[in-house]
């Protein structure tokens, strides 16, 4: 999920990593072999018994039957569309690691330092929650990448992704407090063309994905408030490939440069240098790919998508350093337009302001809605469709009152100039004591 510049901050081939079908077959084969072995042992016992009518008249040995081992069921695999909870695919609650990147230069000692390795082991529960969320994200997005096609409505696409995330986390979010335990980390963003971020359809939206569209798909999955924030861009015309490649390369540059004690400004400078080395030809005209300078990456806190630190995507400015144990969303945005976004179109994204100053509310609708938000979302972002899903109606007046009172922050869509095209790629990284883990990395990007 995009973070605006510091001044704005103030206000799915699913690989079934649960278990390969071949491994399941092998396990089943071993179980059958074990049973055959049991019978074979029984025959040997019987064969050693004295022959019938032996002069010794020895009593016949009774054949002892060993209890048959139960055959193990085959390993579960993910359904299509994804509906099998990730916890059922990984019953031991050990989830796949992300991409492991060793620290470099003065931090290279961390990889083998015993104290740091001990601290790393202490973070296992925290990491498993992140890895579980990341596996949810990978399986959902890989399904989405294969199945999103021009002609579908944005509502159909968004709800398909969100339903899958809820199913795979095992939290439908309909019971009070359930969404705080797991589910959507924030609404599924589907920003088209010149719109770079924070667009998701409201109820009644009829917008249809077109063949010539460039769509940013930005969604989060969380377990216990550990939000995995990752985004990719889809285009159906290869003319936009250089734009997508520029932004993907820039994001990977940011990930490579990020680390403990690294200054934000240095990361931004490296991202900008990579991004702006690309250009794209559209309708016979060459366009330099520009960084959208007032959109940033950000750190992530528990249940809070924008933690307060920003990771710029241009040079200059913030000298703040990244610190051990922090979690960051490294995201970059490229544009063929001005490289600057403004608020535009109908608002859909909202979030409770953490530690907001209490304000007396006169509207009963605002009081009731605030109670619903606190119990169902807390500080997690939500959208109007989520309120509709909970059975809320006629809430707009109360919602606007919460916004004007500074209790809820609205996040309008952020757009460059009309006629331009924008792209986004994003990953969540964890700065572990020993290594940097790109939690959301997959085979796709």
Curated annotation (Swiss-Prot):
Coiled coil: none annotated. Residues 18-33, 47-58 have a biased composition (Low complexity). The keyword Transmembrane does not apply. A divalent metal cation 2 binds at residues 229, 298, 331, 426. GO terms for biological process: proteolysis. Its EC number is 3.4.11.18. Residues 59-74 have a biased composition (Basic residues). A divalent metal cation 1 binds at residues 218, 229, 426. PROSITE patterns: MAP_2 (PS01202). Keywords: Aminopeptidase, Cytoplasm, Hydrolase, Metal-binding, Protease. Residues 1-92 are annotated as: Disordered. It is found in: Cytoplasm. InterPro entries: Creatinase/aminopeptidase-like, Met_Aminopeptidase_Type2, Pept_M24, Pept_M24_MAP, Pept_M24A_MAP2, Pept_M24A_MAP2_BS, WH-like_DNA-bd_sf, WH_DNA-bd_sf. GO terms for cellular component: cytoplasm. It catalyses: Release of N-terminal amino acids, preferentially methionine, from peptides and arylamides. This is Methionine aminopeptidase 2-2. It comes from Aspergillus terreus (strain NIH 2624 / FGSC A1156). The lineage of its organism: Eukaryota, Fungi, Dikarya, Ascomycota, Pezizomycotina.
């Amino acid at each position: 999920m995009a973070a605006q510049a510091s001044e704005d901050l103030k206000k799915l081939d699913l690989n079934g990593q649960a278990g390969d079908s071949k491994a399941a077959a092998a396990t089943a084969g071993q179980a059958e072999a074990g049973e055959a072995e049991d019978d074979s042992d029984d025959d040997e016992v019987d064969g050693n018994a004295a022959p019938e009518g032996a002069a010794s008249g020895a009593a016949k040995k009774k054949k002892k039957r060993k209890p048959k081992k139960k055959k193990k069921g085959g390993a579960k695999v993910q359904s299509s569309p994804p509906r099998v909870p990730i916890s059922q695919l990984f019953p031991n609650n050990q989830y796949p690691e992300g991409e492991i990147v060793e620290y470099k230069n003065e931090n290279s000692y961390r990889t083998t330092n015993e104290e740091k390795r001990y601290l790393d082991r202490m973070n296992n529960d925290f990491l498993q929650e992140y890895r579980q969320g990341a596996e949810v994200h990978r399986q959902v997005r890989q399904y989405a990448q294969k199945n999103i096609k021009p002609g579908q409505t944005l509502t159909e696409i968004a709800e398909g992704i969100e339903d899958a995330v809820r199913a795979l986390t095992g939290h439908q979010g309909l019971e009070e407090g359930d969404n705080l335990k797991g589910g959507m980390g924030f609404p599924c963003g589907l920003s088209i063309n010149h719109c770079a971020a924070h667009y998701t359809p409201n109820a009644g939206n009829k917008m249809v994905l077109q063949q010539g569209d460039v769509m940013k798909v930005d969604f989060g999955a969380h377990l216990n408030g550990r939000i995995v924030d990752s985004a990719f861009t889809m285009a159906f015309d290869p003319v936009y490939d250089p734009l997508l490649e520029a932004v993907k390369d820039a994001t990977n540059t940011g990930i490579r440069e990020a680390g403990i004690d690294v200054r934000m400004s240095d990361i931004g400078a490296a991202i900008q240098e990579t991004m702006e080395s690309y250009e794209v030809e559209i309708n016979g005209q060459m366009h330099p790919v520009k960084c959208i300078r007032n959109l940033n990456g950000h750190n992530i806190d528990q249940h809070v998508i924008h933690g307060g630190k920003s990771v710029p995507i241009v040079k200059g400015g913030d000298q703040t350093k990244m610190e051990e144990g922090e979690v960051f969303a490294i995201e970059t945005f490229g544009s063929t337009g001005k490289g600057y976004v403004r608020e535009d179109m109908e608002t859909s994204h909202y979030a409770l302001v953490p530690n907001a100053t209490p304000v007396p509310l006169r509207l009963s609708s605002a009081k009731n809605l605030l109670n619903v938000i606190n119990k169902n979302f807390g500080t997690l972002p939500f959208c109007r469709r989520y309120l509709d899903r909970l059975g809320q109606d006629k809430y707009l007046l109360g919602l606007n009152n919460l916004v004007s009172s500074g209790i809820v922050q609205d996040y309008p869509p952020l757009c460059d100039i009309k006629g331009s095209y924008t792209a986004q790629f994003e990953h969540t990284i964890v700065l572990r004591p020993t290594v940097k883990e790109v939690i959301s990395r997959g085979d796709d990007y």
